[in-house]
Amino acid sequence: GAAKMAVIGFMNALKEEGRKHNITVHAIAPIALTRMTEGIVAPKVAPLLKPEFVTAAVAWMCAEENEETGHIIEAGAGYYAKVEVREAHGALFGTDTIPTPEQIRDRYSEIADMSQASPFANTSEALRKVFRMVAPKA
């Protein structure tokens, strides 16, 4: 899990840098049989997980005509989907006092409510959102 999120973070950093030079970058979340997974996949499912099912998505993401950047594409077994990391609207406690674990518990349903979630574009954008909420109003 952590290594995969590191890849997404790295992709987001490269996306911002690459944009300046007309370079696109993506991440593939493959659904394919590998040496690591072949012992845990049912034998009747294994033929569906050919790596070749992933290559079409990789080729499209690398194509010059594809102007998108920073996408995570799940690909394999004949299935393809864009995947997003999303951020809930969250809960603002303010900066006057540090919240207690009990306060987090009491408002956790608000913290975890994904009904107004938005794509988590990158850390800089997430920080800007937080700073806009907590900045003193002039």
Regions found by a protein language model. Give the residues of each.
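Flexible, glycine-rich beta-alpha linker
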Residues: 18, 23-43, 81
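Conserved cofactor-binding/catalytic machinery of classical short-chain dehydrogenase/reductase
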Residues: 6-9, 53
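Conserved Rossmann-fold SDR core element
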Residues: 8-9, 15-30, 66-75
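Generic hydrophobic alpha-helical scaffold/packing signal
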Residues: 11, 15, 37, 58-59
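Active-site helix of classical SDR
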Residues: 3
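C-terminal helical subdomain
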Residues: 27, 45-137
